Each structure stands twice: as C-alpha cells, then as structure tokens.
C-alpha cells in the first residue's frame, strides 16, 4: 500500500519518543505544553509513519510564532543527518479534563503538515494517563488526530488504538516506573534552552 490518505496510515511511536512527551507534560502539570514528533515514512512502503524521537517544545507562550519557527528549523537541522524530519505534533491541554483540540494546536499542526502532509497531532488524554497508574491502561495515553478529506482535524475514533501503535509493548510499564521515580523532573524543553543555552533540549541523559 502506498501513502494514501491519512485515514489509511498507521503511526508507530518508539518508547523513548512517547515517554519523553508524557514526562514533559507531567513536569508542567498546570500548563499547556507541546512538542514535535521526529521520524520518517517507513521504507517498507507499508503505510506506516515511524516516530522514532520527540522534542519537548514549550510550556509557556505556545502561540508565539517566532520562537516556534526558530525551534522547528533548529530541530530539522539536527535530525536531517540521520535521515529524519518533523513528522507530527504533540499537545497537552492546560485543563486535566480537556480533550478537545484547541486553536493553537490546530494552527501548529497545520504549519507542520505544510511540510509533511501526513503529520498527525497527538493529544494527551489525562484520564488514560491516570488509569495507567492503576495498571489498567495498555494503549497509548494519547488521542490520534488527523486531517480529513476537507482538511479539518478530527480525532480518530474508537479504532484509534489500531492506528497509533506503541513500537515496544512494554512502553506503558516503563512509563509507569518513570512516573513513580519522578523522572519527569529531568526533562528539558526548548523553552528551557532558550532561557539557558546550557540546558540541552535533546535530553541526552534522560534514559540512562
């Protein structure tokens, strides 16, 4: 199957990319946060977008375009040597019970999809994240949103679990351990880096 409409695609996210985004949202629990998904289209031509890494972006002023554009260029330049690029967007809303895509998320998703038309938005679902701590959640704690034929963002419904796949089945178990050990305190985002350039947005030591 070639790369048809977004509805046919599957998105496979690696454990580290997935965990980093969730930890970032936990570090800034009372704020909206965002990040980008880094990866490539699977060379097997099997309709899979492989998300191999992620970069936590901001925890304040998410709607400001200049810092966003600077960040996207910086991220693209870093990953191009590895044959990877920005393939999607992650968003966590400020309110715990808010699972709607806000205007800011849609706008940034639109911006990224100009360069990578198959780009999804992954939206954090806090209720699923809460269920994780009780050992009840095996599927990703994120909702998959894609563009429909009329270019509007929509949440992929009940079958979303089959479209967004965790590359490593143990990802939620590992995430749960990291949450218990308060690993989220170690996450650095681009926001932190712009304030203090010694802080590394690549988070090289996070999973050591």
Swiss-Prot record:
Residues 11-146 form the MPN domain. InterPro entries: EMC8/9 (IPR005366), MPN (IPR037518). It comes from the Eukaryota. CDD domains: MPN_UPF0172 (cd08060). One of its GO terms (cellular component) is endoplasmic reticulum. Pfam families: UPF0172. Belongs to the EMC8/EMC9 family. PANTHER family: ER MEMBRANE PROTEIN COMPLEX (PTHR12941), ER MEMBRANE PROTEIN COMPLEX SUBUNIT 8_9 HOMOLOG (PTHR12941:SF10). This is ER membrane protein complex subunit 8/9 homolog. It comes from Arabidopsis thaliana (Mouse-ear cress). The lineage of its organism: Eukaryota, Viridiplantae, Streptophyta, Embryophyta, Tracheophyta. The gene is EMB2731.
